[in-house]
Amino acid sequence: MKFIVKLYPEIMMKSKPVRMRFTKMLETNIRNVLKKVDDDAKVQRQWDRIMVMVPKNKPELAQAFGERLACIPGIAHVVQVDEYSFTSVDDIYQQVLPVYRDQIAGKTFCVRVKRTGSHDFNSIEVERYVGGGLNQFTDAIGVRLKNPEVTVNLEIEGDKLYMVTKRIEGLGGFPMATQEDVLSLISGGFDSGVSSYQFIKKGARTHYCFFNLGGAQHEIGVKQVAYHLWKTFGESHKVKFVSVPFEPVVAEILEKIDNGQMGVVLKRMMMRTAARIAERMGIQAIVTGESLGQVSSQTLTNLNVIDRCTDMLILRPLITMDKQDIINECRRIGTEDFAKSMPEYCGVISQKPTVKAVLAKVEAEETKFSEDLIDRIVEQAVAIDIREIAEQMNTRITETETVVAIDTNEVVIDIRAPEEEENKPLEIEGVEIKRIPFFKLATQFADLDKQKTYLLYCERGVMSKLQALYLIEQGYHNVKVYRP
């Protein structure tokens, strides 16, 4: 069993040297991700495709491989195939017949062939021959070239025949690290998660900068979002998560800054700080989730004033997106429920915010800040490898327990993603098991029976510890981590 990875069309349009570099990078990225699923994963680069071989003795890995390939930037689509050898067109037909006889019985069908290599036949001739044979010697209703109920997809390469059993849509975009690094400002809300994802998809190694305005609970929630984005879409490369203690800045804004200017001043202070951090990391651009007109600080006038605080390039991928479109994308990438449970701190800064800030007035207000405020904040910022988020949970989870046995009145919550749970269902005799995906737990936990104790389960124990710590910070103490 194999997967044939088809490159995103924009890659195919590049010059030969660039195309070669992008393809090599994608091959490396795929190998890095799949090796974490199984060390025996084999990846082979060809000119216009990449072959992924499922170990012959481990066919059960096909689903896991397919799920990971669907989340790697730079892939247009993936086809899962079974490989055969052939000597003639009739040999192709004879091998297709037993595979599709039952699948097309009582249905309309068509045959589609893609061919590479030197042969004494073309693709259309194979389609006609195989289609005619299936039509004559099966119980199919007949051939329908437009909108058939079953499409028999075949790929021919040299003397190899590939029967397509499944097609998986890819992310598109460019392979990770083919573009330069960016620093994404992440708050855990709808917008910043989507803007970060957009740059991951575009092939930029996306580091995260979090301005902590709400204490440990806020930081834990945002780390979950960043970790989810990295683990799902950017796992092939290491990135940093930078936490900036921004409460002193907020305190000075509330004490010293004119009420109407607070929102714009806050954003300018964030941009200044992020620019300093980005320069230290050798990064040339900041990414934000701002969308035109969404809030008072995001008018064109105010965005212009905000940009004047730094020479650093500020990128806003969501600038023309509607809020509902952002929420829909948030739902698709799996960060919606995180965002729903995330408090919005910036919105309470100013009671009467200006929508047409004047640069001179804003700069005059900023002279009221302590001279070394930004320096102190930058020095106090903590940067970690995003993989350390999981390790941190092992040391910070002291308020709860990790258990291997289940007592009476304890309920296990399987927090794995639905596809993981379906692939390896958790079954424990005599124990009640609830299935709540981790991205819905924050919003659904309050509805559970408070008289019971809940044991959170995931396969590696990383997300269960993150979720347990988050729930404890919210005031729930009837939660533990289950590690059988």
UniProtKB/Swiss-Prot annotation:
- Which amino acids does the record list as binding ATP? L185, I186, K267, G289, Q298
Identify the EC number(s): 2.8.1.4
Q: Which catalysed reactions does the entry list for this protein?
A: [ThiI sulfur-carrier protein]-S-sulfanyl-L-cysteine + a uridine in tRNA + 2 reduced [2Fe-2S]-[ferredoxin] + ATP + H(+) = [ThiI sulfur-carrier protein]-L-cysteine + a 4-thiouridine in tRNA + 2 oxidized [2Fe-2S]-[ferredoxin] + AMP + diphosphate; [ThiS sulfur-carrier protein]-C-terminal Gly-Gly-AMP + S-sulfanyl-L-cysteinyl-[cysteine desulfurase] + AH2 = [ThiS sulfur-carrier protein]-C-terminal-Gly-aminoethanethioate + L-cysteinyl-[cysteine desulfurase] + A + AMP + 2 H(+)
What keywords sit in the KW lines? ATP-binding, Cytoplasm, Disulfide bond, Nucleotide-binding, Redox-active center, RNA-binding, Thiamine biosynthesis, Transferase, tRNA-binding
The record's section on InterPro entries has:
Rhodanese-like_dom, Rhodanese-like_dom_sf, Rossmann-like_a/b/a_fold, ThiI_AANH, ThiI_fer, ThiI_N, THII_Thiazole_biosynth_dom, THUMP_dom
Cysteines joined through disulfide linkages: C346-C458
What SMART domains does UniProt report for this protein, alphabetically? THUMP
Q: Pfam families recorded for this chain?
A: Rhodanese, ThiI, ThiI_fer, THUMP
Q: Which residues form the THUMP domain?
A: 63-167
Q: Which PROSITE patterns match?
A: RHODANESE_3 (PS50206), THUMP (PS51165)
Q: What is this protein called?
A: tRNA sulfurtransferase
